[in-house]
């Protein structure tokens, strides 16, 4: 079974990143310095299905707000365009503007996401960010960046019913990998499809 966030937990983890509610001690004191960055990271995972390694590899010039897109380097070195909606774009733009205004960062460092030491953020640091806020939103689940990716994949599959689209967006080379991961949702998709089919004049029956 896929471990993922449920619908009500998705806004909860974003709220935790934005507000810091539920954090304690050092986490709470650092939150004001990291909340814009952390919110953008959580939003990107939930809204695009990006991999942790792809996220930390992003550079400032990989983002194109005019097309709501960014370029990631996939396994094997392939460069692929991913798209985000306006909601995700809002979080990303807020951080992007903060990042460009950061005078402490080296002008030669093109990394999009920076640590508090103003160097490219690490995958371990991103794991800890996700762990921190998911501990508030879903304390009984062990949520990782990959689980947020699974959450996105689940949402996309439920919305499209198209396993091939999900495989393509997630960057799975073999669609059978995707089918295996999301097999449990297939029955729900079929059930929803059956409900959508009308065999009479629905307008007349209203």
Go through the PLM ranges and name each one.
Residues 1-206:
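Conserved catalytic core of the tyrosine transesterase superfamily
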């Amino acid at each position: 079974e896929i471990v993922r966030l449920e619908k009500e937990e998705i806004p909860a983890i974003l709220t935790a990143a934005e507000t810091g509610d539920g954090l304690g001690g050092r986490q709470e004191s650092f939150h004001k310095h990291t909340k814009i960055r952390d919110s953008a990271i959580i939003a990107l995972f939930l809204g695009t299905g990006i991999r942790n390694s792809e996220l930390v590899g992003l550079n400032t010039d990989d983002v194109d707000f005019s097309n709501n897109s960014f370029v990631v380097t996939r396994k094997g070195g392939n460069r692929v365009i991913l798209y985000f909606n306006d909601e995700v774009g809002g979080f990303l733009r807020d951080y992007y503007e903060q990042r460009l205004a950061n005078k402490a960062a080296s002008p030669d460092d093109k990394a999009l996401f920076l640590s508090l030491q103003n160097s490219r953020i690490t995958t371990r640091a991103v794991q800890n960010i996700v762990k921190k806020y998911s501990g508030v939103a879903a304390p009984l689940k062990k949520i990782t960046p990959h689980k947020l990716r699974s959450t996105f994949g689940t949402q996309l599959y439920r919305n499209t019913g198209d396993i091939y689209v999900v495989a393509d967006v997630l960057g799975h080379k073999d669609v059978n990998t995707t089918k295996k991961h999301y097999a449990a949702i297939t029955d729900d998709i079929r059930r929803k499809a059956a409900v959508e089919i009308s065999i009479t004049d629905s307008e007349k029956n209203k």
